[in-house]
Amino acid sequence: VHRRGVGLVFQDNALFPHRDVEDNVAFGLRVAGVPVESRMRQVAEMLRLVGLDGFAARSVDTLSGGEAQRVALARALAPGPRLLLLDEPFGSLDRVLRDRLVGEVGGLLRALGQTALHVTHDRDEAFAIADRIAVLGKGRIQRIGTPAEVWAEPGTVYVARCLGHENLIELDSGGRCPLGRLAKGAGTVLVHGDRVVIGPSGDNSSPVGTVVESVFRGETTLVRIRVGDLVIGVPSTARVGVGSEVAVILEPGAVVPLD
């Protein structure tokens, strides 16, 4: 792999347990025949970039999970690879540490101008670190684009489900469902919950539904509303009690057709 100019970072970091931090980071440089003096300068710079100044002589057995992944990243970056492949690198870390490292690693890779391919099953992780996302399914790329593009227009039911969209609605031959006429004919559409407004039930121009669930999620509350035989989820900053009747108002761009 190193002969092809590819650096690798794995979920379990795969550090050499019999080597200290400095020797781990220097491994690729040593294989490439980089002279000792230059090698040590590059190792020191890599450790500085990943926030591990002063860790050179540390045994890898004494490192935390986050520190070990930083060492693995420094080792992969040290030889200056054409491509960096990260295979679920944060999967074994707790959520708080994972979120912090995702931001730091993404910023570092951009600062270095490093081309990277990051493999993950975590949607939020992909959105946070990627400039472009490819959603794979059945051995093929199902959708590719920026995080914003892929989220707004998944293209297919498969991709929408992979991304965690829950408002996937089947329309009849007239393009109708309990929310009204959403298309010209039969098919499946995505209704973006963040483009749905919950209003007073007295608004006769909009369908009226009943709140069947209200799930607190910190900054927002996920409100699930039953309209006829359909239930949709809407994030809301307002507290709406279960059993309340509300109008469901679709803003422009709320409805996206899917294949």
What spans do the regions from the language model cover?
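ABC ATPase NBD coupling module
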Residues: 1-7, 31, 36-41, 150, ...
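Conserved ABC ATPase "signature" region
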Residues: 37-55, 106-107
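Conserved ABC ATPase signature
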Residues: 59-63, 67
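A short, proline-enriched helix->beta-strand linker immediately N-terminal to the Walker B motif
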Residues: 78-82
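Catalytic Walker B motif of ABC-type/P-loop ATPase nucleotide-binding domains
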Residues: 84-88
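ATPase nucleotide-binding modules
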Residues: 148, 152-212, 219-239
